[in-house]
């Protein structure tokens, strides 16, 4: 067995303590995780204070959805910081780092799988869309995150990594269709089109950054280091989650009357049923 293969085997069998040591030795990676944990803690306290006077059922649902975003994030980032959801992967032949062991913070996909549906739930409630449309957006989003995780973890085939990346992007296109085509009309009918439009653009622009980072980072063509990629993801998370949720919750707290309905309708957007 060569020295290179011995090193590779050792890294693949690395313990959580070994992974934690590797994280802590990488300043960019380590700082990108802890900054997010600190911000999530502050945001949780802020959102509790902002939502204390909200009373209407629909507004409360929006508040709960926005609260879950930093709650999920702080839990998931703590998993990254501990090394629990980070591991070494040997890149397959054809990859730019073929044969090398790459540190993979795959726990980010858990963050996105549980937090991004809450963002869509909050947006759907704001637009007062119908349950079928909301279900479509959330399930497509979960599919996007799960297939993205598969793309990141596959080590048997370089081609299959990109196949799953393409499938993930296809799910993303479905989410974009709902956000850009279906929900704006619902928001217009609900009287929330102005704030919905702002949050829609913020979400779409920032979410487009994730597949770009994947492609440029060590999971894709490896033009960016693990630490730089991690900071890119953390920066996007801060804007797409905490800033988004703050803008939404601030608007809801100040305009609760505009979202005073009881919640989702079944069938045709937020339109009220016709009288007999």
Curated annotation (Swiss-Prot):
Q: Indicate where this protein resides in the cell.
A: Cell membrane
Query: Which Gene3D superfamilies does this entry report, sorted A to Z?
Result: Rhodopsin 7-helix transmembrane proteins
* Keyword terms: Cell membrane, Chromophore, Ion transport, Membrane, Photoreceptor protein, Receptor, Retinal protein, Sensory transduction, Transmembrane, Transmembrane helix, Transport
Classification via InterPro entries: Arc/bac/fun_rhodopsins, Rhodopsin_retinal_BS
Q: Which residues lie on this side of the membrane: Cytoplasmic?
A: 52-57, 128-130, 181-192, 255-276
Keyword presence, Cell cycle: no
Q: Which family does it belong to?
A: Belongs to the archaeal/bacterial/fungal opsin family.
- Provide the protein name: Halorhodopsin
Upper classification of the source organism reads:
Archaea, Methanobacteriati, Methanobacteriota, Stenosarchaea group, Halobacteria
């Amino acid at each position: 067995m060569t020295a290179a293969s011995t090193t590779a085997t050792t890294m693949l069998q690395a313990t959580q303590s070994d992974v934690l040591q590797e994280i802590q030795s990488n300043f960019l990676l380590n700082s990108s995780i802890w900054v997010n944990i600190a911000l999530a803690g502050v945001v949780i306290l802020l959102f509790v204070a902002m939502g204390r006077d909200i009373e209407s059922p629909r507004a409360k649902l929006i508040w709960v959805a926005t609260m879950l975003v930093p709650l999920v994030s702080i839990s998931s980032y703590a998993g990254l910081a501990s090394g629990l959801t980070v591991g070494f992967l040997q890149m397959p032949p054809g990859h730019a780092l073929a044969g090398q062991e790459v540190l993979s913070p795959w726990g980010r996909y858990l963050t996105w799988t549980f937090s991004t549906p809450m963002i869509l739930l909050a947006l759907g409630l704001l637009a007062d869309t119908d349950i079928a449309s909301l279900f479509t957006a959330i399930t497509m989003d979960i599919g996007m995150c799960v297939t993205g995780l598969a793309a990141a973890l596959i080590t048997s085939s370089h081609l299959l990594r990109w196949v799953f990346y393409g499938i993930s992007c296809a799910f993303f296109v479905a989410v974009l269709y709902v956000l850009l085509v279906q929900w704006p009309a619902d928001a217009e009918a609900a009287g929330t089109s102005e704030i919905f439009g702002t949050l829609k653009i913020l979400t779409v622009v920032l979410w487009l950054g994730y597949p770009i980072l994947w492609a440029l980072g060590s999971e894709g063509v490896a033009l960016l280091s693990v630490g730089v990629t991690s900071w890119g993801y953390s920066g996007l998370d801060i804007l797409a989650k905490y800033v988004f949720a703050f803008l939404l919750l601030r608007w809801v707290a100040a305009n609760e009357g505009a979202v005073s309905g009881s919640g989702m309708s079944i069938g045709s957007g937020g339109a009220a049923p016709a009288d007999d």
